[in-house]
From Swiss-Prot:
Keywords: Actin-binding, Cytoplasm, Cytoskeleton, Repeat, WD repeat. InterPro entries: ARPC1, WD40/YVTN_repeat-like_dom_sf, WD40_repeat_dom_sf, WD40_rpt. This is Actin-related protein 2/3 complex subunit 1B. Component of the Arp2/3 complex composed of ARP2, ARP3, ARPC1/p41-ARC, ARPC2/p34-ARC, ARPC3/p21-ARC, ARPC4/p20-ARC and ARPC5/p16-ARC. WD repeats lie at residues 8-47, 53-92, 97-138, 143-182, 203-242, 257-295, 331-375. SUPFAM superfamilies: WD40 repeat-like. Transmembrane segments: none annotated. Its main location: cytoplasm. Expressed at low levels in all tissues with a relatively highest expression in inflorescences.
């Protein structure tokens, strides 16, 4: 199996992030706190810090790799930037100016900004003002018709992709004079105004989640709540879009392993591999952790029987369903809510990543021994 370490930290985990040297992990145990653990051995983790400032559930955590700062957001509509001073983490309040919950957060590639998605149909772009010694929040208020479920920065540090429960994926310019430079790799976005919409994708007819850019920034991927995953090439005026449907439960988040391979995680409790062939056509490949590639020959009648048994609480059907889950890996016992790469940002390939879920576990996966099984796309 590709999983190399599994540890249960809590009853449930909302989100998690790793320190720059990967020796510590920050997680929210589905409450108002952020717990920081340090690995003493493969089987033993020590809790070093408990960050307590939020009044409601912490919904997003990101740990910067260069400045070693932690940013957190919560349903209490606030954000904190935590700096390590001596042996203590010191918080700085960031007033987001939201009237609904903050749902997700991510540092920009240069770590001079971070983006916050919210239930207020708004995206906050926050940056630090040296003159006033505080964090400023600029709002992108237009276009979104519902909650912003995820945000993803383009490698050029200017473009930002978002997904929303209105079913749409959008790309905005976040160029801020005095913060961003005009020598951005993408020439036109640096000339656009802050908050200007570059692209809107209407591919999903259900809630959309988990948007991510490929390492080069040429491809965009996100998922829909209707068990669909979408891939968009040549993001711009004439994008090339593909939709891949799968028969299992919906995904919640995705991660590009390489330019032609994506890992998706969600309600099926096991990572799924999608890859593009030599012609650029994307398809589902297999589950990570199962002993062999997923077979398309499984009878739909047996699947219906399992579902029927679950609905009526049948013990025999429940056992069958559990056996099927174990054959796919069985690392997580509940929905996987987040996937985080383990390695240097901007790397063309990701060999290791971690997942966390509602079962309170964090699993570390290593694809080093699976390259032959995953094929040339890796």
């Amino acid at each position: 199996m590709a999983v190399v370490d599994v540890h249960r930290f809590a009853e449930s985990i909302t989100c998690h992030a790793w320190s720059p040297d990967l020796s510590m992990v920050a997680l929210c145990p589905n409450n108002t706190e952020v717990h920081i653990y340090k690995s003493l051995s493969q089987d033993h983790w020590e809790r070093l810090h408990v960050l307590q400032k939020h009044d409601q559930i912490v919904s997003g955590i990101d740990w910067s790799s260069k400045s070693n700062k932690i940013v957190t957001v919560s349903h209490d509509r606030n954000s904190y930037v935590w700096s390590l001073e001596g042996a203590e983490w010191v918080p700085t309040l960031v007033i987001l100016r939201l009237n609904r919950a903050a749902l997700c957060v991510q540092w920009s590639p240069k770590e001079n900004k971070f983006a916050v998605g919210s239930g207020a149909k708004t995206v906050c772009i926050c940056y630090y003002e040296q003159e006033n010694n505080w964090w400023v929040s600029k709002l992108i208020r237009k276009r979104h018709e519902s909650s912003v479920t995820s945000v993803a920065w383009h490698p050029n540090n200017v473009l930002l992709a978002t997904t929303s429960t209105d079913g749409k994926c959008r790309v905005f310019s976040t160029f801020i004079k005095g913060v961003d430079t005009k020598d951005s790799k993408a020439g036109s976005p640096a000339e656009t105004k802050f908050g200007e919409q570059i692209l809107q994708l209407d591919l999903s007819y259900s809630w959309a989640f988990g948007v991510k850019w490929s390492p080069s920034g040429n491809t965009l991927a996100y998922v829909g709540h209707s068990s669909m995953i979408y891939f968009v090439d040549d993001v711009g005026p004439s994008p090339l879009a593909q939709s891949v449907a799968f028969r299992d439960l919906p995904l919640r988040d995705v991660l590009f392993i390489s330019e032609k391979m994506v890992i998706g995680v969600g309600y099926d409790s096991n990572p799924m591999v999608f890859a593009a062939d030599d012609t650029g056509i994307w398809s589902f490949i297999r589950y990570i952790g199962e002993k062999k590639a997923a077979s398309s020959g499984s009878s739909y009648s047996s699947q219906f029987s399992e579902a029927f048994g679950k609905f009526y609480g049948s013990q025999s059907k429940s056992t069958t369903a559990n056996d099927a889950s174990d054959s796919r890996g069985g690392v997580h016992d509940n929905s996987i809510t987040s996937i985080v790469p383990l390695g240097k940002g901007g790397s063309p390939k990701v060999m290791r990543f971690s997942t966390s879920g509602l079962d309170g576990k964090i699993a570390i996966w290593d694809l080093e021994n699976m390259q032959q099984e995953l094929g040339n796309q890796f």
